Amino acid sequence: YEEVERLKHKHVDKVHLVGNPVRPEVLVLRDEDYPAFTEDGLLKVLVTGGSQGARVLSEVVPDGLAMLPPALRQRLQVTQQCRVEDLERVRERYRAHDIPAELGTYFEDMEVRLADCHLFIGRAGASTIAELTAVGRPAILIPLPIATDDHQAANTREMVKAGGARMIRQPAVTIKEVTGWDDKDNRTRVAQADAFQKLAKDISLQIQAMAMAPQTLANAAHAAWNCGRPHAARDLADLVESFGGIDLMDVIRVGGDNHQRTTETAQAAGLANQDRAA
């Protein structure tokens, strides 16, 4: 990202911004158009919470979508990743709201689903941000509140400032695990229920702000795309190469002119070490 925190001033001139490399199967989607979203067409929403899913999204996203105006709610097509223990409960919630949703604990073809969606809802890890901006997908981001140094919130800044995403804070009370039934625990449960309700409402309001007019969502997609750094892997490799001389690069580059000689030298050194050990 452009902004680097806790960096000593004397090191500012040494900073090289390359971005976060993304998978090739995601990167190829960068040149594809944002899927058409019309006044009466489907609104395809992709919801994920990282590799293990995020329980809070299972709690609040179905209810938030149900709060949308009927004209928009009836056009929803949802794909959501859930934890295995939440799957049936979330399915029942979508069924009760009469919202079509495909649920799963893991999607192997996530790049296909990312390409097909109009709007992403999820956490704000660095890899997620990199993929969203590489492809150009607008997002509602809910940073993990217990992330070290609040780094997920920091991850959202560039995308939010550009207009490619909206960020919603998850109240800390929602992550507390309550197992008892004393007065304090019951008060916490009430506070959690209120916080979940507010979070669902915030999601609904942000979706309306982005999706009630098709052009607004398309503009957000373009803004997200402009934040992408598609050449991160190449730029990082070039930067690493710039630190070394020719001999070092021959070791690093598989297939370099001296690769065979380097390999033979390493093998010979290994045999010599074996002889000494014997």
Please state what every model-predicted region is.
Residues 2-8, 89, 128-129, 149-156:
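Short, glycine/polar-rich helix-capping loops at beta-to-alpha or helix-loop-helix junctions
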Residues 192-193, 209-278:
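C-terminal amphipathic helix plus adjacent low-complexity
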